[in-house]
Amino acid sequence: MDSTISVQPGEAPDSLHRARRAAWGSFAGAVVDWYDFLLYGITAALVFNREFFPQIGPAMGTLAAFATFGVGFLFRPLGRIIFGHFGDRLGRKRMLMMTVWMMGIATACIGLLPSFNQIGWWAPVLLVFLRAVQGFAVGGEWGGAALLSVENAPQGKKAFYSSGVQVGYGVGLLLSTGLVSLISSLTSDQQFLSWGWRVPFLFSVVLVLIALWIRNGMAESQEFEAQQSQDNAPQMKKRLPVVEALLRHPGAFLLIIALRLCELLTMYIVTAFALNYSTQNLGLPRELFLNIGLLVGGLSCLTIPCFAWLADRFGRRRIYITGALIGTLSGFPFFMALESQSVFWILFFALMLANIAHDMVVCVQQPMFTELFGASYRYSGAGVGYQVASVVGGGFTPFIAAALVTFSGGSWHSVALYLTAGCLLSALTALLMKKHPVD
């Protein structure tokens, strides 16, 4: 696009040291934010219906718990607008330090929150408030972290260097699932419900301090600094960054929403909804999907950078479409495996969805989305599109899936169709969208 400012092949790339510091800083913050955000989803599936909604029955309590999970996504676009605006004006690094602080404090407070039996309806009210703060913080995280790594990355290696943001997702999933699984194995059911689930939330403080130390060494990208020099000239004053992005590239927001469906549905159905469905509807042990979450998180630390390297070599679009089609073909077999209660096939199709399909589409998102917008409003544009997609396609995925099962008499077919259709739409969107030179 003619309005997009990017490093051209003939220009000198950012130093390798600068690129690596940006990649590590983006990775560290992403670990904290995704650890906190995913920990909530895991705990909502296991605990929150009984701790915060015991008065409305198991089925409705599950729906209420998953609804609070979705609340975080509702506030992500607002966080993206606020952090994106100031990130485009004041710099990415300042905003990224703030998102980590905010997420860590909110998560630790959830770990200290009294239950419904202790303070009544104030418990779920405060839970929703803290979840909203989490959503607001993570809303500001992705765009800034992705931009800092993409803008600092050497030309031709942007997918690989920016993949740390998504690897942070995998490490966050690994840590959150692993710690919940460890505490679950060391405590009785009553102890886990009483205090055990709180330990992983309080552990977030340690991760926050580590991430802040790493991020403090990051520098702004040369591309952003160059753009700021242009924008400081009187003749270059512009509208608010988010308004600029909306006016210049309205179609880009719809593209991002459609492209993220595969990623969001595959991950949240496998890691959040299936955990609840398999334990409450099928009687499978909760350790099964907690261990699957561990495996998914661990493998993604390898698969995401590998797929990103392949995308830089063979084209982003090819990798993305392949992943989305794998997700399309794995939806119904995954639920058939659940019904059969075969551990081998459950594991196989869970990995096909949450590792292969999911990781192939997320590994190219940072450069694919950010290059839809100009550098002066990229934080706002790519970030708002990303977070609106989170609301539309991801935030209420466990809630929608649970509602489909509840109102269809316990049948899984509608959820499998929901998953399959979303992945197929993502594949078709990638196939038909305007081709980028590196795709």
Segments and roles (model prediction):
Residues 89-100, 313-324:
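Cytoplasmic membrane-interface "Motif A"-like loop-to-helix N-cap segments
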Residues 101-119, 326-341:
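C-terminal ends and interior cores of transmembrane alpha-helices
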Residues 185-202, 403-421:
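A membrane-interface helix-boundary motif in multi-pass transporters
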Residues 318-364:
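C-terminal transmembrane helical hairpin of 12-TM major facilitator-type secondary transporters
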Residues 160-184, 385-397:
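Glycine-rich segments within core transmembrane alpha-helices of 12-TM secondary carriers
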Residues 211-218, 368, 420-439:
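Multi-pass alpha-helical transporter architecture, strongest
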Residues 41, 250-299, 394-398:
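Extracytoplasmic gate region of multi-pass secondary transporters
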Residues 44-76:
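Extracellular/periplasmic helix-loop-helix junction of adjacent transmembrane segments
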